[in-house]
Each structure stands twice: as C-alpha cells, then as structure tokens.
Amino acid sequence: MTILTVRQIQNNYYTEYYMGPVRNFADKKEVYFDAKVNNIESKVNKDKALLHITLALKYDSNFPSNMFQAQFKLGNWSSEKIPLQKAPDKKSDLENKIHYFYATLEVPRTALIKREINRISEYIREELTIAFRLNDSSDRYHWSNYNLFDTVAADMYQTVIKETVTFGNMIRLNQLEGEKEGNIQQSELKYGWTMLDYRNMGPLEEVNNLINIKFNQPVKVVSVGVTVSYTAPDGKRQELKDQAEYQHTLNPNEEFKLNFPRRLSFNRVTKKLDFDPNGSAVFLPQGGFGSYEIKLEANVGNQFYTIVATNSFEYAHPFDDPKTNDFFLVQYAPVYSLFNFSDLIQ
C-alpha cells in the first residue's frame, strides 16, 4: 500500500496532506478515489430544472472537505467547478472511508430537450455527467511536489459518473437503505427505503423483495416497471423487462413492499429467465450475477413522482454447480473390537 504525501505552502506555512489507496484495480493499480451517486431529487417547472444530488465519495485522506469540487453537465448545459458541501443528513462511514457530499443545481429549462409525454404529467429524460476535481490543483506554486499532487488527483479526474435523470418529479435511489427529507420546493416531504443485500447469495436464494419504501404523505402507486439485467455462467448478458399498471393506495408512513410482480423460471437449455406462472422469483440455479432497476410512478401528496431504484445481486455458490454433487460424504468411525463397539452404545 502506497501512501502519497504532499505539502501545501501558503504564507510560508506548510500543511502536510496524505492520500491512501481505497482499493486495487485488477490487483495491480492502487486506486485513491471512488465515487457514486447516492440519491437524486429533481423537479422541473416552466423556467428551470432543479436538482439536489447526494454523492458518496470514497477516499482515505486528511484533505479538508472544501477541497472537493465537481463539474456537472446536463443536456446543453454545463456548470463551472462547484464546491461540494458535506451532507448534513448523512454520517460518514469512516470504517469504509465513505464520505457524503451534496450539490444543488439550477438548470435553465431551455437547455433540456423534451423527450416524451407521460400520460399523467410531462417529463424529460437527460443524461447527467459528473466529473470530479480538487480545489486549487492548478496553483502549482502552492504545492511542494505538484507532480505527486497530480498523481493523487489523477483518479479523481478519471472518475466520471453518468446517470439518467427523469424530471417531473424524480427521486433516484442507489443505496440499499436511507432516509431523506425533500430538498426541492417541498421541504415537508420525508421518505425512507430499504433494499436487501443480494451480493452474496446462497445456492437456494432468490431475488424476490425488491424494495420497501414509505412516505410521510398519502401515496397512490399507478405504475410499476422492473428491468432485470444478468450475466449467466456462459458469459452472455441478458435483460428482462416487466411493466404493469398498478393501483395501490398507501396512508402516510405506511410501507409499500414491492416483490417481483411476475413469476419466472430458468431455462437450463437456453440459459435464460422466462416468464412462468408456475415459477419463482429471480433464481439462477447455475449461478451468475446482475442487477435490477425499479421504476415506480406514483402520486405523493399532491405531486406526481417517478421513483427509480437500483440494486445488484450475485451468487456466491450456485445450486447446479458441476464441480459438486448432491451426495453426503460419510466418514465412518473404525470399530476395532466388540468391546469398543459395546462401549459406544452404552
């Protein structure tokens, strides 16, 4: 493990900073920075689009939090470098070196391209691109070894996140669990969610419960869509989609528990999941890995929302593993005399 150290020089004072690796890439390259989107809330009106983005940054460093910046691109609009703020509603996970930040964006409506019309409300889809930067990195004279500093920052500059944002209104959930208060023109909105951790599934486990979510306002779910993408043991990637109208009304703080809406079975010949009324949920007996994306459309209070959540799954030990068999291995204790045998049964 290589710890990189630089010194910042300002007004003849030296401040020493370090950055340690947070993971290895292909067991060779040490990676010093990682990032993912934790949560996105979006809203659009006739003049502008509003976004509140919570980011999970993974780093092992004593850099002050105001060192981290990001540039955002959405549609035909792009931002300058925006300082990231520490998220007040998320505590850092110091054990796993994860720190939470947020940014609030205002994007002119004219920069967005109208994609399609929803039957209840108009919505817009755009790809959001996030690139990360370190503050002050261009001021070479501030650093005792700028080339080393540039090495420290290189992983950050190469980290680019792309997410599809749906406006009118959208909540995107990428973490397994959390609680949030609305941050965009509806501060009274509160919601919480949980998704099961399917990343280390046993031989007979299946992906069934997709998400549990509740709001502090009345909810009417009108549509549910699920997309499952998975890679079978032969390396082929497949996708399965299920979309259905839905009528489900919830009281404030009542939990909506969504299981996989239709039954499936795994075809051992084609190595594919097929819809089967006599089947189960997502079950890959020969192993594999993948992810699912949920898209809920619902009226929450007096607002219409699109709620998108993603989760991943992987089998640690498949059921139909040709390397193993279904027989018990019995190890018999040797009996050397009738006297010993007599002792054993007394």
UniProtKB/Swiss-Prot annotation:
InterPro entries associated with the record: DUF5443 (IPR035233)
Pfam families: DUF5443
Name this protein carries in UniProt: Uncharacterized protein MG285 homolog
